[in-house]
A protein has these predicted regions:
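Membrane-embedded alpha-helical bundles that constitute the cytochrome b-like, heme-associated redox core
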Residues: 1-204
Length: 204
């Protein structure tokens, strides 16, 4: 792959990780967070999506979610497998964040694929994607743990990826601005993690 082409692919990968994939994750966690209000609140909130015509909803899912997500995931695996880690020689915070970003990315490919199978695929087969479905999914302690790790991996990957996005796109160039966005990304991670974990525990 030529350097110019790889540069463009990496920029596209970075952009799609924030828009629309990152925005969708924040929306998805916010929607699931309604589960803390109980079964009716959750079902009413998620049921609003059913008001969108099926063909339009399907088109939106593929264009806004699935296609960008698959590109970001598969190209991300390529980056993870070909990237050079400096953690053996340098114990800096950013080098460890770099390594964790790649590790969580690979894990999320497995987690997201399984989550889609348990929800969207089952819906296509006639199952109802509602509060009770999630209760049944996390009824197994191992599956609950798997989902918690998946949620934390996703929120970290987004928060740290947001920092990388701002740097790679030249938005934060000075050490001070990068330090500030480090704190912002930590805040994003904590807030989204609390929402995500609280949501999944609401089904227990």
């Amino acid at each position: 792959m030529s350097k110019d082409r790889e540069f463009l692919w990496r920029r596209l990968h970075s952009l799609l990780g924030v828009v629309p994939v990152g925005l969708f994750l924040a929306f998805h966690l916010s929607l699931n967070f309604t589960a803390v209000g109980g079964e009716k609140v959750y079902n009413d909130a998620t049921g609003l999506m059913e008001l969108v015509p099926h063909s339009l909803l399907l088109l939106m899912e593929w264009v806004i979610i699935y296609i960008p997500l698959m590109f970001h995931a598969f190209y991300g695996v390529y980056i993870a497998l070909t990237a050079t880690h400096n953690t053996k020689n340098f114990s800096t915070f950013r080098n460890w964040m770099f390594k964790l970003q790649r590790f969580t990315g690979i894990f999320l490919v497995i987690f997201v694929a399984w989550h889609v199978f348990q929800t969207r695929v089952q819906k296509a087969l006639g199952a109802d994607v509602d509060f009770n479905m999630m209760v049944e999914i996390v009824d197994n302690p191992w599956m609950l743990g798997f989902y918690i790790v998946g949620i934390l991996s996703a929120t970290f990957h987004l928060a740290n990826g947001l920092w990388s996005f701002l740097v790679s796109w030249g938005i934060t160039q000075s050490p001070k601005s990068q330090q500030i966005t480090t704190y912002i990304s930590m805040f994003v991670f904590v807030v989204l993690s609390i929402m995500g974990v609280a949501a999944i525990l609401a089904f227990v």
